[in-house]
Amino acid sequence: MRKQFLIAYRGYSSIAPENTKLAFQAAQVFDFDGIWIDIQLTKDKQIVVTHKENFKVSNKNLNLNQINLVDLKKVNLASEFKLKVTSQQIQTLKEVLTQFIQPFKYLLIHIKDDKENNNSLLEQLNLLCKDFVLAKEKMILLSSNFHIIKLINETFKGFKTGFVIANKKALLVASRDELMRYCRFLVPNESFYHKNCKEIQNLGLPVILWVIKGLLRYQFYENDRFVKFQITAQIY
């Protein structure tokens, strides 16, 4: 039995294209406790699951906010993957929640920072979450923008949040009291946490750690009482 929750980074992305239905299905088959996914808005204000900010559509390289969902669905996300797999369409967040909120223990939703669309994305996300009774229980909303974390607390009553941090500069945007008030988790990347674990632990919040690479690192953090989730592209 695992000591912590093991979360598949953008799905089981070492064996399937990241942030695709196939990657999420693989994570389910291999018994991950949940998935980490990234969300952004399309031109027509649809929440889609992707880390990428631009796509080639009709032989043109376009930013995501220039593409409507119907055209984005034509892109094969598996075309450049290292293994030959079936064609994969981009997924809307609604499609992912419909299929995967039930079987997984947790869905970690990373809200990509886009100053032009942050408010619209949060409005759409808030409406969507109301359609899923398990949303508050199973979703953890993540952002590297502390302003977004505060907005989530104001508009998403009862939802768990995690502040994504990669360096000391990120820790300076909020006081310890603000972090305790607005965040349920701190979400440092592994290399930053490894070098600054005492400072982060002194903030007093549980940790979601990303991205773990290698069995030895995974086993090392198993004994860290602050680490509650390990995010990885491998099964351990």
Curated annotation (Swiss-Prot):
InterPro entries the record matches: GP_PDE_dom (IPR030395), PLC-like_Pdiesterase_TIM-brl (IPR017946)
Keyword Hydrolase listed: yes
GO molecular function, one term: phosphoric diester hydrolase activity
Gene3D superfamilies: Phosphatidylinositol (PI) phosphodiesterase
GO biological process, alphabetically ordered: lipid metabolic process
PROSITE patterns, sorted: GP_PDE (PS51704)
S-adenosyl-L-methionine keyword on record: no
Domain of life: Bacteria
Family according to the record: To glycerophosphoryl diester phosphodiesterases (EC 3.1.4.46). To M.genitalium MG293.
Name of the protein this chain belongs to: Uncharacterized protein MG385
